[in-house]
Regions:
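Short coil turns that delineate tetratricopeptide repeat
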Residues: 17, 49-51, 83-84, 118, ...
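Position-specific recognition of the canonical hydrophobic site in helix A of tetratricopeptide repeat
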Residues: 31, 63, 98, 132, ...
Length: 388
């Protein structure tokens, strides 16, 4: 048996190590293990080799590594030569320009690519990116509509459209987009979640509940359970709401919104102690939340503990001195204790902040009525009724 000469084997190894395949694998290896600079050096070396073959895969790797200038240098060298891949060249150049925040140049290049291949949805997606960067969301929507015509089953394009519409408060259009997502990929939780949020915005509570149920089924998280609970409560399905708030708290005991909202549900059911228990847990998480302190005090009032409630109202006011609701609630508390003068002072402050606060005028009228200042009381009642 004839064995190859050692010098010949070494030569083959040397040749392989200088080959395109070896350097390409080497670059990917570097990039995979976080050595981006070494990978970029390898890729640029591959692009600088004399070859009639287009190296667009290498360019894509450079763009992914955010080496936009290196990719751009190669692509701009190719621009002078006519070839069949001009549309892809323009697309990749546009990606480089976007990466370098050169949006007008990117827009020009991607429009050139679209002229050559208008049926390519990826090109339309990039044009939409350009319009969004330029602040023209309606033109971005048109571009994404064209992308959908080119690729009708691309759920992610529908999702992008829905997000844009939702951001600009066009909730019905957004809903249609998210419905399309759910039809194309019915097991994606995030699509059902966004569909549910649009139903909520449109006050379609039953549909919102149904969509949140689907979202929870395909990707259950405590946040989704909490949103479903909120929907049920808003839809007057209180038992189901409580059930899902409890489910949320089972898996995430410190879920602040669920603790606060469940406390409100219990308070509305006259279960003040259960409400207080929830609020106590919430207070341990965020002890300086003025709205939480207000709700805590409100629950104490319903237990007849007005003195303690007043302390929490004052603590809340120290955090937000000009909050109308907290001011009013403290005034109610003071009135129940017969602390007329402080109540009058705080109500006057409230009415300076909000001169049309009808409940504030009515409460002030009641105080003056209790202190036998009847003419002043009548003036206050007239203002409460918008008669003066």
């Amino acid at each position: 048996m004839n064995l190859p000469l050692a010098s010949n084997v070494k030569h083959k190894r040397s040749t392989f190590k200088s080959s395109y395949l070896w350097n390409s694998l080497h670059a990917k290896w570097h990039y995979r293990f976080g050595k981006s600079e070494d990978a970029i050096v390898n890729w640029v070396d591959l692009l600088n080799r004399d070859s009639t073959k287009l190296r667009f895969n290498v360019v894509r790797n450079l763009i992914e590594a955010q080496a936009f200038q290196e990719a751009r240098d190669y692509l701009e060298r190719l621009e002078d030569n006519e070839h069949e891949e001009s549309s892809e060249l323009n697309y990749l150049l546009a990606r480089c320009y976007i990466g370098q925040a050169l949006i007008p140049q990117a827009k020009k290049k991607i429009e050139q690519a679209i002229q050559t291949k208008p049926q390519n949805s990826i090109y339309w997606d990039l044009l939409a990116d350009c319009f969004l960067e330029l602040g023209d969301w309606r033109e971005a929507v048109k571009a994404l509509d064209n992308s959908l015509r080119a690729a009708p089953k691309h759920a992610e394009t529908n999702y992008r459209l829905g997000i844009i519409y939702a951001f600009h408060e066009e909730y019905l259009e957004a809903l249609r987009c998210f419905q399309g997502c759910c039809q194309l990929k019915p097991h994606r939780s995030v699509y059902w979640e966004m569909k549910a949020e649009m139903h909520l915005q449109l006050e379609q509570l039953t549909d919102a509940c149904h969509s949140f149920e689907k979202a929870l089924r395909y990707g259950g998280t405590p946040d989704l359970a909490a949103r479903l609970a909120y929907c049920y409560v808003q839809n007057n399905q209180i038992k189901k709401g409580i059930k899902y708030y409890k489910l949320t708290l089972k898996y995430e005991p410190d879920h602040y919104d669920s603790l606060s909202n469940l406390a409100a549900v219990y308070q509305n059911l006259n279960r003040s102690q259960d409400a207080l228990n929830m609020l106590e847990r919430a207070k341990n998480i965020y002890p300086k939340d003025p709205i939480l302190l207000n709700n805590y005090a409100f629950t104490l009032v319903h237990q007849g503990r007005t003195r303690k409630a007043a302390e929490y109202y004052r603590e809340a006011l120290a955090l937000t001195p000009d909050h109308p609701l907290i001011l009013y609630n403290l005034c109610v508390c003071l009135t129940r204790k017969g602390n007329w003068q402080e109540g009058i002072d705080l109500l006057n402050l409230l009415l300076e902040l909000d001169p049309n606060h009808s409940a504030g005028w009515a409460l002030l009228g009641n105080i003056y009525d209790q202190t036998d200042q009847f003419d002043t009381a009548i003036d206050c009642f007239n203002k409460a009724l918008k008669l003066a």
